[in-house]
From Swiss-Prot:
This is Large ribosomal subunit protein bL20c. Binds directly to 23S ribosomal RNA and is necessary for the in vitro assembly process of the 50S ribosomal subunit. It is not involved in the protein synthesizing functions of that subunit. InterPro entries: Ribosomal_bL20, RIBOSOMAL_L20_CS, Ribosomal_protein_bL20_C. It is found in: Plastid, Organellar chromatophore. The gene is rpl20. Belongs to the bacterial ribosomal protein bL20 family. The keyword S-adenosyl-L-methionine does not apply. The keyword Ribosomal protein applies. GO terms for biological process: translation. One of its GO terms (molecular function) is structural constituent of ribosome.
């Protein structure tokens, strides 16, 4: 079998990994073997946390809406149920933003939902 010289290709592959590992601490950013492990782990964490971020933000919005609606004498679940009955189509992100930035408008939304 013919000899395969792949020094250039291997170097490019290793440099690609080392570029991804720039900024990592110690040998994790400079030695290929440890950098490769750290990069693979980092990419796994990034993939997982892109999905987790959606859940976390939804939980945050619900907590904010719940706190603001309780100040107006209504629990979160009752508020969401009455918003659906009143056919008010505000999503949780917008409701949380309204509760945080403009509490009087949020109180008006709660009053409309109650009636």
């Amino acid at each position: 079998m013919a000899r395969v010289k792949r020094g250039n290709i291997a170097r490019k592959r290793r440099n690609k990994i080392l570029r991804l590992a720039r900024g990592f601490r110690g040998s994790n950013g400079s030695l290929f073997r440890t950098a490769n492990q750290r990069v693979m782990k980092a990419l796994c964490n990034a993939y997982r946390d892109r999905r987790r971020r959606k859940r976390d933000f939804r939980r945050l919005w619900i907590a904010r809406i719940n706190a603001a609606s309780r100040l107006n004498g209504l629990s979160y679940s009752r508020l969401v149920g009455s918003l659906k009955k009143a056919n008010i189509k505000l999503n949780r992100k917008m409701l949380a933003l309204l509760a945080l930035a403009d509490p009087t408008s949020f109180a008006n939304v709660v009053v409309v939902a109650k009636s």
